[in-house]
Amino acid sequence: MNSGILQVFQGELICPLCMNYFIDPVTIDCGHSFCRPCFYLNWQDIPFLVQCSECTKSTEQINLKTNIHLKKMASLARKVSLWLFLSSEEQMCGTHRETKKIFCEVDRSLLCLLCSSSQEHRYHRHRPIEWAAEEHREKLLQKMQSLWEKACENHRNLNVETTRTRCWKDYVNLRLEAIRAEYQKMPAFHHEEEKHNLEMLKKKGKEIFHRLHLSKAKMAHRMEILRGMYEELNEMCHKPDVELLQAFGDILHRSESVLLHMPQPLNPELSAGPITGLRDRLNQFRVHITLHHEEANNDIFLYEILRSMCIGCDHQDVPYFTATPRSFLAWGVQTFTSGKYYWEVHVGDSWNWAFGVCNMYRKEKNQNEKIDGKAGLFLLGCVKNDIQCSLFTTSPLMLQYIPKPTSRVGLFLDCEAKTVSFVDVNQSSLIYTIPNCSFSPPLRPIFCCIHF
C-alpha cells in the first residue's frame, strides 16, 4: 500500500483528543468519533448536551455505544505498529536472531519461540504478544468502566451534599419559625418546653451542618482520587502494546483499592420535639373525610429530587419494583372554602404515599400530571429511595429531614391563614407547615399510593 494512503488510513483511526489510536471508540450524533475515556474526561461536568470539539454541534452524552467497526480497525492498526516494532533489528532475539513474538506472563518479558521452550521458561504461561496486549487492554477498559460508574455516583452524591449544605441553614430557620408559630397558638405555660425544643433544634442543626461540610470534603477528595486513577488507567491503555505489557504491574490491584470505602451522603435527621397538647388543640377542628377511590396511571406523581422515583405504597416485606405498580387515588368527597379543619391518615410502616389538599381545578386536570412544586398541590409525601425513606412537602417542593411517621399523620387546614400543617400524631410533633398557600377554593382532600 502507498505510504501516503497508509498514513491517511491510520489518521482516520486516531482520536482527535488524545492523538492515539482509538480505544473503545464512540461515535456521537454529528458523526465524529472519540475514545470513550477521552470523551468522558473532557465532558464530565456537563450533564446533558455537549459540544463536539470538532464541529461544535451539540450532542447528548447518554447511552453511548462502542463503534465496533472502528474498534476492530484501530486494533488492526496497533497490530501493524507492533509488527513493525518487533521486526526491527534491535528487537531481534540476541541468542537465536528470531523475532520475539511471545510474551511470558511470569517475568513479563518478550521471547522468541525457541526461548519460550527453554529450560528457564518452559513451565511459564506464554501468550502471543498481540493477544496478551489486547487482553490486558480489555481488562483495563473493564476496570475503567467500574471506576467511571463510581465516579459518576460520587459526583451525584457530591452534588446532593453540596445542595444540602448550601440550603441547610435556611431549612433549620424555616423549622424554627414553624415551631415558634405553633407555640404561639398554645397556652403560655408551654414557654419552657418551647425554649427547650428550639435550643435542641439549633444544636442539632449546627452539628449536622458541620457533618455535611466534612462529608462534602470527603466526596470531593474521593472525586480527585477516582479521576486520577481513571486517568492513569487511560494513559496505560494508550501505551504501545509492548510498553503496556511490561509496565502493567499492580495497576489493577491499586484501582480495586480505590473503589473501596466510597463515601455515602449523610441522611440528616432533625428531631421533632413533642408539643404538649398539640393534638387536643387540633381535635377541636376534627372532621371526618369521606373518600372516593379511583385507579390511576402508575406515574401520576413524580418526585424530581429523588430522580424520578414514583410515589406509591408497598410493605417492607415486598421486594421493591418486583411487579408492575398500580396507582390509586382517593379524593375527598367534601370540599372546603373557608374555616379550619383537621383530619388524620393512618400510614403505618408503609412508604411511597402522598396526601394533602389540592385546588379543585387540579382534580379536573390530566391525572398524569407530575409534582413540580407549582401552586395547587399542598402535600406531604414519603418515598423510598434505595434503603431509606424520605419525607417531602410541596408548594414548593422541599425535603423534610425529620423521622418518618410510623402510625398516624394529621393534617390541619387553615383557609384564612392560607396554611397547611402536618403533624406526627404519635410524637405529638409538627412535621411542617406550608405557609402562604396559593389556595383557589374550593379545596379538596387527596390521597395517593402505589401498590407493587
From Swiss-Prot:
<feature type="domain" description="B30.2/SPRY">
    <location>
        <begin position="269"/>
        <end position="452"/>
    </location>
</feature>
<dbReference type="GO" id="GO:0045087">
    <property type="term" value="P:innate immune response"/>
</dbReference>
<dbReference type="Pfam" id="PF15227">
    <property type="entry name" value="zf-C3HC4_4"/>
</dbReference>
<dbReference type="InterPro" id="IPR000315">
    <property type="entry name" value="Znf_B-box"/>
</dbReference>
<dbReference type="GO" id="GO:0005737">
    <property type="term" value="C:cytoplasm"/>
</dbReference>
<keyword id="KW-0862">Zinc</keyword>
<dbReference type="InterPro" id="IPR003877">
    <property type="entry name" value="SPRY_dom"/>
</dbReference>
<dbReference type="Pfam" id="PF00643">
    <property type="entry name" value="zf-B_box"/>
</dbReference>
<feature type="binding site">
    <location>
        <position position="121"/>
    </location>
    <ligand>
        <name>Zn(2+)</name>
    </ligand>
</feature>
<keyword id="KW-0479">Metal-binding</keyword>
<dbReference type="InterPro" id="IPR050143">
    <property type="entry name" value="TRIM/RBCC"/>
</dbReference>
<feature type="zinc finger region" description="RING-type">
    <location>
        <begin position="15"/>
        <end position="56"/>
    </location>
</feature>
<feature type="binding site">
    <location>
        <position position="93"/>
    </location>
    <ligand>
        <name>Zn(2+)</name>
    </ligand>
</feature>
<keyword id="KW-0863">Zinc-finger</keyword>
<feature type="binding site">
    <location>
        <position position="115"/>
    </location>
    <ligand>
        <name>Zn(2+)</name>
    </ligand>
</feature>
<feature type="zinc finger region" description="B box-type">
    <location>
        <begin position="88"/>
        <end position="129"/>
    </location>
</feature>
<dbReference type="GO" id="GO:0019901">
    <property type="term" value="F:protein kinase binding"/>
</dbReference>
<dbReference type="InterPro" id="IPR001841">
    <property type="entry name" value="Znf_RING"/>
</dbReference>
<dbReference type="Pfam" id="PF00622">
    <property type="entry name" value="SPRY"/>
</dbReference>
<dbReference type="InterPro" id="IPR013083">
    <property type="entry name" value="Znf_RING/FYVE/PHD"/>
</dbReference>
<dbReference type="InterPro" id="IPR001870">
    <property type="entry name" value="B30.2/SPRY"/>
</dbReference>
<comment type="similarity">
    <text>Belongs to the TRIM/RBCC family.</text>
</comment>
<dbReference type="InterPro" id="IPR043136">
    <property type="entry name" value="B30.2/SPRY_sf"/>
</dbReference>
<dbReference type="InterPro" id="IPR013320">
    <property type="entry name" value="ConA-like_dom_sf"/>
</dbReference>
<dbReference type="GO" id="GO:0008270">
    <property type="term" value="F:zinc ion binding"/>
</dbReference>
<dbReference type="InterPro" id="IPR003879">
    <property type="entry name" value="Butyrophylin_SPRY"/>
</dbReference>
<feature type="binding site">
    <location>
        <position position="96"/>
    </location>
    <ligand>
        <name>Zn(2+)</name>
    </ligand>
</feature>
<dbReference type="GO" id="GO:0061630">
    <property type="term" value="F:ubiquitin protein ligase activity"/>
</dbReference>
<dbReference type="GO" id="GO:0010468">
    <property type="term" value="P:regulation of gene expression"/>
</dbReference>
<protein>
    <recommendedName>
        <fullName>Tripartite motif-containing protein 49</fullName>
    </recommendedName>
</protein>
